Amino acid sequence: MTTPISPTQPASIAYDDAPLTRFHIRIAVAGTGGQFSDGFILGIIGIVIAAAGDTLGLTPLWTGALGAATLTGLFAGAIAVGPVADRIGRRWIFGWDMLFFAVLSLLQFFVQTPGQLLTLRLLLGLVLGADYVVSKSLVTEHSPRKFRGRLMSLLAVAWAAGYVFAYLIGFLLTGHGDNAWRYMLAISALPALLVFGFRLGVPESPLWLARHRRDAEAADVVRRHLGPGVLPPTAPPLSQHRGFTALFGPAYRRRTGVGALFYVCQVIPFFALGTFSSQVMEALGVTSKMGAGALYNVFLLIGAVVGLLLIDRISRRRFLVGTFFIGAALLTVLILFADAGASAIVVIGLFAAFAFLMSAAVNLEFVYPPELFPTDLRASGVGIATAASRLGSAASTFLLPVVEAGHGIDTALVGCVVILLVGGLVCWVWAPETSTESLLDTDLAPTSG
């Protein structure tokens, strides 16, 4: 790991080309708390639904609604907080949102009705939507260009770790009394509380400060944390057209569309199959649902780590397009083999391979959207992409059990294949390459379309 520049060395290194320091890693690790918590509460809900069904009197409608509740809250939180974070900054939202998350997580322990749990899941989603926006923006803006992909991918690994940890907690607590599901829900407060104190000392983004003409503050952050050898960022004045007006205007509408569509097409099959993996395995004829789920989650975590290792070795476009088309092919083969009566080992293996691939691709959800937009639109742009994806995910987790019950698992899986193909085609035609772009250049030069 590179250390900061010597105090005797004159400032000569561009902010975006600064060497990697402990400060950068600390910022990235601080950003992982919300992602771990998000992965956990989204991963645990399927297990909780199965365990609390009788106690809460869950109908198929309540099951679908609870599966989609957090995602729906994420939609609202991301789209509402994005413009706010672009106007007031990232630091304070980033510092305090995990405390609210911890309180809401603990309240889940005391729910008595499906409606109470639904309300808390929606509120948790709102907080996580805010955290998605500010975490991705803040970590991106603090990261040197050369290491940005890997630092942002730490957030993806944290998300996968939270998702897998949820499965482990569910496995350990299932069968330990009628209230075991309450502990499954409340335990998500622990990582949020751990990261809360760690975040309070994180400084504001120098890029955001410079963009808002607070140059002295930006220079002070750079000097204190990166040393005098790194030049503070400079930025043009704020555009007259900001927020959603600019995002859907001629300069950025293509990037806004690509950011939203790739995200939607990636997470719909990921969340639909992940949330109800046990039910999917049962419908495909696999009797060892717990073993299948364990393998699925192991490959989920491995995929996220492999994605981190690959993210700066493969162009963003190649990673995007390739994982969409390969994912569609894997899922098609899975359907055909399952229909042909393939053994459980083959079906589970294909499902695990799909989980591995999609989890590796999830790294792009953390790296790519923040790179598409300039600093004064970054949180809003990430908010639009996140909101669109969570709306699609909420719909898919609500509809998958309904479609599977009415038309069979093949119909649900074929729908996922179609969505993956659409995502691949959209990225093939319109996705720009961002891995070599400086964030300073993105601020200075509006893109076309």
Regions found by a protein language model. Give the residues of each.
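Transmembrane-helix signature of 12-pass secondary carriers
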Residues: M1-G449
